[in-house]
Amino acid sequence: MEVSNSCSSFSSSSVDSTKPSPSESSVNLSLSLTFPSTSPQREARQDWPPIKSRLRDTLKGRRLLRRGDDTSLFVKVYMEGVPIGRKLDLCVFSGYESLLENLSHMFDTSIICGNRDRKHHVLTYEDKDGDWMMVGDIPWDMFLETVRRLKITRPERY
């Protein structure tokens, strides 16, 4: 069995080297491949954990509504003996009295600040330095600047 290699030869004399052929002039294509890293739109939409777009848009709308008043100071409130804490916005209260009234209703107990009466729970707070102090020792405005979390302690501790 014979295998023949036949190639047609192309002579350079048949092509004029000074004039580019129409096929040569149209070959000047630039190939540019770009792989987009992450578009700004996509970066803004990356959530973890992933949530549905309708829920994301709803939450986004609520954030925009809250930005108008920008007055919220959420702190966590714990009560000794109660396994679940609560989150509370301190900016809705006018002072210590309204805070104590709300906490007494929320935890269904009587709470005091400042005085040490053995019949009532005592409200303490952690300041920005990590120290625990009695609520009511400083003015309300200063309290709002320093409070990090609240704890309702048992009466027997004091």
Swiss-Prot record:
It comes from the Eukaryota. One of its GO terms (biological process) is response to auxin. Residues 1-40 have a biased composition (Low complexity). Disulfide bonds: none annotated. Its main location: nucleus. Homodimers and heterodimers. Aux/IAA proteins are short-lived transcriptional factors that function as repressors of early auxin response genes at low auxin concentrations. Repression is thought to result from the interaction with auxin response factors (ARFs), proteins that bind to the auxin-responsive promoter element (AuxRE). Formation of heterodimers with ARF proteins may alter their ability to modulate early auxin response genes expression. Belongs to the Aux/IAA family. This is Auxin-responsive protein IAA31. It comes from Arabidopsis thaliana (Mouse-ear cress). The gene is IAA31.
